[in-house]
Design a protein with these regions (language model features):
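Short Gly/aromatic-enriched secondary-structure transition segments
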Residues: 39-46, 224-225
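Short, charge-rich binding segments
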Residues: 44-46, 54-57, 103
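C-terminal nucleotide
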Residues: 1-27, 52-85, 182-331, 346-386
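A structural signal for short, well-ordered beta-strand segments
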Residues: 111-113, 208-210, 343
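FabD-like malonyl-/acyl-CoA
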Residues: 128, 342-346
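Gly/Ser-rich oxyanion-binding loop with an adjacent helix/lid
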Residues: 1-22, 28-32, 37-41, 76-79, ...
Length: 386
């Protein structure tokens, strides 16, 4: 993101004066999919694409916002009980209200912002926007007294209370806590986390966006969550002495005990979740050892599980995964909820050009459009630029 680009738009729209510039990143998740609501681990990292915003207090009770990308301007009062209608502005409004709840005395300000997080790629542009403004308001009006975790929760509460999205905490967490050259293992239950080195010399990390999103009948995500909860319920009934909140608390042996009772579909879904828990821990060991071949192997295993057991893949994503295998890509898998979106690929630099060319050619020949190529580098989280 270009600082001068954002600054020039800010100056143009707000009296020719400059303010402070802040940035927050989007994110990837290397491994640990559909584990958050099962009490497991996720493995995100902040990336070199995000949101950049310039802010300056304006001495009033009015917040004036300009979206550079949308060329849209919205203003609202700090204490407006309803907030703006524009969906993009509600993220800023929500963060303002949540930071006020945390004791930050937010006053009126002018802001212009832009982003280079590709929309529809599952890289959490909304979390980047929330994190950017939470960080900025904490700096401008809160004397930086609000903790990073409270900023994460303010972003999550913004989604819940003002934008109608019942999200977890991974996206905001990655945007706020991101660290250059490191991925983070986050325990979704305890919120404990640990940094792991991710410096794959000789490799590139690239997303291939299938540019499809399949709308399925019913509630596919709720169905899978219900499957997992059903398995836990059956295991808990067999082991009344234990404490079983989620599949995180269950063993392979206990899953096998209830296989006949829960049915094949629920069994397969629970089998994936337990396997994913083990894969995340294996990736932790591999990263500490600098063993990226094992990391890649586990990525392929996750894709296989998401496709065949959890059944959240689609023809296009499986096709991209097959192309990765054919081209000797070290690791490839679905990233995100599934039914469309991206694959995330760990590929050796010497194979990169041939892989991308082959993926574009074959995907275009089969589906009539090229996948979008998104190169990413693991980068720092929310920060003040100047």
């Amino acid at each position: 993101m270009d600082i001068e680009f954002v600054r020039s738009r800010f100056i143009k729209h707000f009296d020719g004066k400059t303010g402070n510039i802040y940035a927050s990143p989007g994110r990837i998740n290397l491994i640990g999919e559909h584990t958050d609501y099962n009490g497991g681990f996720v493995f995100p990292g902040a990336v070199d694409k995000g949101i950049m915003a310039e802010l300056r207090p304006n001495g009033t009770n009015t917040i004036m916002c300009y979206s550079i990308d949308l060329k849209d301007r919205v203003e609202f009062k700090v204490d407006d009980p309803k907030g703006p209608r524009a969906s993009w502005a509600r993220y800023i409004y929500g963060v303002v209200q949540e930071m006020r709840k945390l004791g930050v005395d937010v006053k009126g300000f002018n802001t212009a912002f832009a982003g280079d997080v590709p929309l529809g790629a599952g890289m959490s542009s909304s979390a980047a926007l929330e994190s950017c403004f939470a960080f900025a308001l904490n700096d401008l009006f809160g004397d930086n007294k609000v903790s990073k975790w409270d900023m994460v929760l303010a972003g999550q509460a913004t989604e819940h209370n003002y934008c109608g999205v019942n999200c977890g905490i991974m996206d905001q967490f990655a945007s706020v806590f991101g660290k250059e050259g490191c991925l983070m293992r986050l325990d979704c239950r305890s919120r404990e986390f640990e940094y792991f080195p991710f410096k794959p010399v000789g490799y590139k990390l690239v997303l291939l966006n299938s540019c499809v999103k399949h709308e399925l009948a019913g509630s596919p995500y709720n169905d899978r969550r219900n499957s997992c909860e059903n398995v836990v319920k059956h295991i808990a009934a067999k082991h009344p002495e234990g404490k079983f909140e989620t599949l995180r608390d269950c063993t392979w042996e206990q899953l096998e005990e209830v296989k006949a009772e829960v049915g094949e579909e629920d069994y397969k879904r629970a089998h994936f979740v337990l396997g994913e828990k083990d894969r995340v821990l294996a990736v932790c060991e591999a990263l500490n050892a600098g063993d990226y071949e094992t990391v890649g192997k586990k990525m392929y295993e996750t894709h296989e599980g998401l496709s065949k057991e959890y059944e959240v893949s689609c023809e296009e994503l499986d096709f991209l995964n097959d192309i990765a295998k054919e081209n000797g890509v070290t690791g490839s898998r679905i990233m995100g909820g599934g039914f469309g979106g991206c694959t995330i690929n760990l590929v050796k630099e010497e194979l990169y050009d041939a892989f991308i060319a082959d993926a574009k050619a074959k995907y275009s020949a089969k589906y009539g459009k090229e996948p979008k190529v998104i190169d990413v580098v693991i980068s720092d989280g929310s920060r003040k630029i100047c």
